[in-house]
Curated annotation (Swiss-Prot):
Record's comment on post-translational modification: Proteolytic cleavage at the N-terminus by the prohead core protein protease gives rise to the mature capsid vertex protein.
Record-annotated site: Cleavage: E10, S11
The organism's place on the tree of life at top rank: Viruses
Annotated organism of origin: Enterobacteria phage T4
Descriptive protein name: Capsid vertex protein
Pfam families in the cross-refs: Gp23
Physiological role: Capsid protein that self-associates to form pentons, building the capsid in association with hexamers of the major capsid protein and one dodecamer of the portal protein. The capsid vertex protein self-associates to form 11 pentons, building the T=13 laevo capsid in association with 160 hexamers of the major capsid protein.
InterPro entries per UniProt: CAPSP (IPR038999), Gp23/Gp24_T4-like (IPR010762)
Length: 427
């Protein structure tokens, strides 16, 4: 607060704008408290271009290891697969007990002769699932016998990884408020702390701007959750349902979205964001709890805990009704996982100070000699472009902050639109 006093004093005692140098102030606590840090991965930067790194864990077929059930380091190794038959409509009729076959790079073993003979399902993938349930075939993930890797010519599967880098330019937001010295004196005379009042005014409005940017970007990059016959268009229709039925249906979809994220990324969802009405439906259904003893675990911005353990955040400004399930995970000191990354630019200040978010400046109007106090915030907001690109060459030219290209591409957050009865407001 003393810094703003110093700014005001400087603006009224300096004879010329060219002589007085604007005083750079650190930052404000109010902004930090209002930013939804629980739904975005935060990585501070002191460079005008924020750099992010991503690690891919790949199998010998250059697939993400977590997206396939295939194993390569055991009895059915990478080279062994070249001799294993691929399952097709024709080959499935020739299989006998003890045979190995592969489907989508996963190896299976036949447990009885002609395992598909009595399965009438025409869809090959579903027929295979039925055969597994009926114990006609099994997944073949066996470890190799010790002797397999003792020979000099044994083939050992490669453990592959790839580190990618992408960059996003830091951008700016700026707000100002005009104040006369007389107004500041009147505020003080009426019991207000004028510097504190002005600081909180600008900081709160700036935090609201950043929050909207984060939430609306999260809506943009999240993949749409579509289920045949239920949410074909990415919307669930609750306009006809009773309150208990609507709550159960929406909570069920939230739980399915949690499982979807875990299957697609191996990470467990850590938060749920919903529009005001969607959050109210979850609360009315009884699936939302907020006990006094939960306060020490619950973020001050959260609405409460869902029954599956996810904190629920309420988006009160959204033009649509929706629910998003997503991941923000801090793994160790350097590794952060999230659907989008928020990188506040700290202008060379202490990166360990969590309050470093923006900077105050005073500019004096040369005509009235009255000061205007402004708050400038710089930050980068980015999604991972490697979830978009078809290949590495294309990925290098994609800007992670280009929300047009990032739309609907993130595997770490899933959105479901919610159709509700329209509210009638009397004029």
């Amino acid at each position: 607060m003393a810094k703003i006093n110093e700014l005001l004093r400087e603006s009224t005692t300096t004879n010329s704008n060219s002589i007085g140098r604007p005083n750079l102030v650190a930052l404000t606590r109010a902004t930090t408290k209002l930013i939804y840090s629980d739904i975005v991965a935060t990585q501070r930067t002191n460079q005008p271009v924020a750099a992010f790194y991503g690690i891919k864990y790949l199998n010998p077929d250059n697939e993400f290891t977590f997206k396939t059930g295939a194993t390569y380091a055991g009895e059915a190794g990478y080279v062994d697969r070249e001799q294993i038959t691929e399952l097709t409509e024709e080959s499935k009729l020739t299989l006998n007990k003890g045979d190995l076959f592969k489907y989508n790079n996963i190896v299976y073993k036949v447990l009885e002769d002609t395992p598909f003979a009595t399965i009438e399902e025409s869809d090959l993938e579903l027929a295979l699932q039925i055969a597994i349930v009926l114990l006609k075939v099994r997944l073949f993930s066996d470890a190799a016998s010790t002797s397999k890797f003792e020979s000099s010519d044994s083939e050992i599967a490669d453990a592959r990884f790839q580190i990618n880098k992408w960059q996003t330019a830091v951008k700016s937001r700026k707000l100002k408020t005009g104040i006369t010295v007389e107004l500041a004196q009147d505020l003080e005379a009426n019991g207000f702390d004028a510097p504190n009042f002005l600081e909180d005014l600008l900081a709160t409005e700036m935090a609201d701007e950043i929050n909207k940017d984060i939430l609306q970007s999260l809506i943009t990059v999240s993949k749409r959750y579509k289920v045949t016959g239920i949410t074909d268009s990415g919307f669930i229709d609750l306009s006809y349902a009773s309150a208990p039925e609507a709550g159960r249906s929406l909570y069920r979809m939230v739980c399915e979205m949690v499982s979807h994220i875990q299957k697609e990324s191996t990470y467990t969802a850590t938060f749920c964001v919903a529009s005001a009405r969607a959050a109210a439906i979850l609360a009315a259904s009884g699936w939302l709890k907020h006990k006094p003893e939960d306060d020490k675990y619950l973020s001050q911005n959260a609405y409460g805990f869902l029954a599956n353990g996810l904190p629920l955040y309420c988006d009160t400004n959204s033009p649509l009704d929706y629910v998003i399930v997503g991941v923000v995970e801090n793994i160790g000191e350097k590794e952060i996982v999230g659907s989008i990354f928020y990188a506040p630019y700290t202008e060379g200040l202490d990166l360990d100070d969590p309050e470093h978010v923006g900077a105050f400046k005073v500019v004096v109007d040369p005509e009235s000699l009255q000061p205007s106090i402004g708050l400038l915030v710089r930050y980068a907001l980015s999604a991972n472009p490697y979830t978009v690109a078809k290949d590495e060459k294309e990925a290098r030219i994609i800007d992670g902050g280009d929300m047009d290209k990032m739309a609907g591409r993130s595997d770490l957050s899933v959105l479901l639109g919610v159709k509700l009865p329209k509210i009638i407001i009397d004029e």
